Amino acid sequence: MPELPEVETTKQGIKPHLEGRMITAVQVRNRKLRLPVPLNLNELCQGKHITAITRRGKYILLHMDKGYLLIHLGMSGHLRIVSQTANPQKHDHVDLHINNGLALRFCDPRRFGLFIYIDENPYQHPLLAHLGPEPLSDDFNSEYLLRKAANKSQSIKSFIMDSQIVVGIGNIYAAESLFLAKIHPNTSAKKITTEEFNSLTGHIKKILESAIEAGGTTLRDFYSSDGKPGYFRFALKVYGRKNLPCLVCENKIETVVIAGRHSAFCPHCQPIIT
């Protein structure tokens, strides 16, 4: 699933082509996404100008002079900028035509994403209203996590992947951050010390910033808006490296299933706290 760096990379990639431009048409080929694409999306958007493009967690918001488009890439989606005459591929579901001859094309093979119109304040929409702070913001710090973790028996990995605690951290960056902080992913959140939270928040911020600079992590379906892969996969320390030697201690990387997800870790560098 595209995580915060992939979504931020996408936002930065589409922004120069769309911001300040007028939408001339919306072409919908398949409405059946996680939430149905509105039947009248063309009428809602045609003739409107895109005034800003922002990100909230894993959501991209296209601000128009009236209304908003809320986009989520789902499990396997991506946005790319194409010529309006470019032939669509099998899973290209929505085209947003702009008055510069280009189109924003939404591809989603597994159709877990969304492309919806919001009339009112988008931050009060049920999908956004209860999201936690951005991990790269000053609000996300060790004191905040320590307060939220009090009496939480869930694993620290599940804790930092909870979008109501902090947004945008998925399986890849959770595993990598916990490795660098030397915290076992199955450790109970309430057992994490202030010092460990200091380390963890610092590593989360550094990893996300590095991943954004590298254009995200391409493992299967993610490509940036210009069709290029992300290169942060070459910097991964534990994710996708099961049974390979740890790059620090040379012990074998192992995985454990936490909340239905395989979590990679080094048993030597990340001892479990009992």
From Swiss-Prot:
The keyword GTP-binding is assigned to this record: no
Lineage: Bacteria, Pseudomonadati, Pseudomonadota, Gammaproteobacteria, Legionellales
Keyword DNA-binding set for record: yes
Cofactor, how bound (note): Binds 1 zinc ion per subunit.
Keywords, alphabetical: DNA damage, DNA repair, DNA-binding, Glycosidase, Hydrolase, Lyase, Metal-binding, Multifunctional enzyme, Zinc, Zinc-finger
Active site residues according to the UniProt entry: P2, E3, K58, R261
Subunit and partners: Monomer.
FPG-type zinc finger segments: 237-271
InterPro entries referenced in this protein's UniProt entry, alphabetically: DNA_glyclase/AP_lyase_DNA-bd, Formamido-pyr_DNA_Glyclase, FPG_cat, MutM-like_N-ter, Ribosomal_uS13-like_H2TH, Znf_DNA_glyclase/AP_lyase, Znf_FPG/IleRS
UniProt cofactor(s): Zn(2+)
Function field: Involved in base excision repair of DNA damaged by oxidation or by mutagenic agents. Acts as a DNA glycosylase that recognizes and removes damaged bases. Has a preference for oxidized purines, such as 7,8-dihydro-8-oxoguanine (8-oxoG). Has AP (apurinic/apyrimidinic) lyase activity and introduces nicks in the DNA strand. Cleaves the DNA backbone by beta-delta elimination to generate a single-strand break at the site of the removed base with both 3'- and 5'-phosphates.
Protein's name according to its UniProt entry: Formamidopyrimidine-DNA glycosylase
E.C. code: 3.2.2.23, 4.2.99.18
Superkingdom of origin: Bacteria
